[in-house]
Regions:
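Short, intrinsically disordered/low-complexity patches at protein termini
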Residues: 98-100, 114-115
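Amphipathic alpha-helical scaffolding segments comprising HEAT/armadillo-like alpha-solenoid repeats
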Residues: 1-2, 22-33, 53-65, 87-99, ...
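Eukaryotic acidic, Ser/Thr-rich intrinsically disordered low-complexity regions
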Residues: 2-4, 11, 22, 112-145
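Short terminal alpha-helical segments
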Residues: 1-26, 34, 38
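Structural detector for internal amphipathic alpha-helices that build alpha-solenoid repeat scaffolds
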Residues: 10-22, 41-54, 65-69, 73-85, ...
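Short coil turns that connect the paired helices of HEAT/ARM alpha-solenoid repeats
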Residues: 3-8, 33-39, 65-73, 100-106, ...
Length: 145
């Protein structure tokens, strides 16, 4: 994990990413905390983005939580990876997370806007029930366009 620190030179960071490809337990790359913190998040997102849908699927909730703040390192890498994901696999978890966030909409307003970006995943977008799709489409159009 030390090699992934953004304070390292690019060669060391690339070596860290390369070595991480052999790590089987990828939950270590889901926004690690102390002692590494945000300094490694961008490279962790790069590592996760290279993983298969099958490898990532147990961590949908954590990946969606990464979208809570667009300023967090690696957020756009995670967004772009989720847009490419098999939407059918993501549908149930995405719907649950969005409905949970809507229960406290005022507190989760920005996160819901960020989650709306995943409507660009056409399989996911098509699979949403009409009501949820319309709510998120309105957010998408007001935030991303």
């Amino acid at each position: 994990m030390d090699l992934l620190d953004w304070n390292n030179n690019s060669e060391d960071q690339l070596l860290g990413i390369k070595l991480a490809r052999d790590v089987k337990c990828i939950n270590a790359f889901l926004q690690p905390g102390f002692p590494y913190g945000k300094r490694v998040w961008d490279n962790c997102a790069k590592i996760l983005s290279e993983r298969t849908d099958e490898e990532l699927s147990p961590y949908f909730v954590e990946l969606l939580e990464w979208l809570q703040d667009l300023n967090w390192p690696g957020t756009f890498i995670i967004i772009n990876r989720l847009i490419l994901f098999n939407g059918d696999s993501l549908l149930e978890t995405y719907s649950k997370v969005v409905y949970t966030a809507l229960r406290n909409e005022e507190e989760n307003n920005e996160w819901l806007d960020h989650l709306s970006k995943l409507l660009e995943n056409h399989h996911l977008s098509k699979g949403l029930n009409r009501n949820l799709h319309n709510i998120m489409l309105e957010r998408y159009n007001s935030f991303w366009r």
